[in-house]
């Protein structure tokens, strides 16, 4: 298992796996359905851990980490199928959020603030 992979590395790894099959990537609508399915599985797991609904005794053991991994895999597939570089998409989103929301929330005090 590789540690500290870049998103580019992850996208290439997923593409290497998917490209060995004739079927290739699912269509965008099918991937959106898969993404929704994985969100539901994540929600179910979060509900078991933090909500009032315990797992049934016969229910398989799972973790939030596993569900996030499944969700991330589908996201990488979606990006690859659409020729979207996830790193670039993330940078664009963070630039937008850092600009738009820089004064939206109450900032934590820095140590420098205590010396004024």
At which residue positions do the language-model features occur?
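Flexible "arm" and connector segments at domain edges
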Residues: 1-68, 72-116
């Amino acid at each position: 298992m590789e540690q500290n992979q870049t998103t580019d590395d992850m996208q290439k790894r997923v593409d290497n796996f998917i490209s060995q099959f004739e079927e290739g990537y699912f269509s965008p609508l099918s991937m959106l359905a898969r993404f929704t399915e994985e969100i539901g599985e994540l929600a179910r797991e979060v509900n078991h851990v933090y909500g009032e609904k315990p797992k049934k005794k016969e229910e398989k053991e799972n973790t939030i980490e596993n569900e996030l991994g499944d969700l991330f895999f589908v996201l990488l597939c979606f990006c690859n199928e659409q020729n979207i570089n996830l790193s670039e998409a993330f940078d664009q989103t963070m630039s937008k959020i850092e600009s738009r929301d820089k004064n939206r929330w109450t900032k934590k005090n820095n140590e420098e603030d205590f010396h004024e």
